[in-house]
Swiss-Prot record:
Family from the record: Belongs to the bacterial ribosomal protein bS21 family.
InterPro entries linked to this entry: Ribosomal_bS21, Ribosomal_bS21_CS, Ribosomal_bS21_sf
PANTHER family hit by this protein: MITOCHONDRIAL 28S RIBOSOMAL PROTEIN S21, SMALL RIBOSOMAL SUBUNIT PROTEIN BS21
Protein name listed in UniProt: Small ribosomal subunit protein bS21
Amino acid sequence: MPSVRLKENEPFDVAIRRFKRTCEKAGVLSEVRRREFYEKPTAVRKRKAAAAVKRSMKKLARERARRTRLY
């Protein structure tokens, strides 16, 4: 869990904004949403495989775009 210490003479609203930003960077809310309901191990494997395919397609598209810009 991210923590934020109040600085000297810092408004509470600013500290809340910093806390929200650190939570966003740490991925706390997305993790909570992902763990809200039980996910079967097969569903986990399927989701991870789909993410790997998406990453590889994105990498391939970037390579193709870079290759076409060279000419």
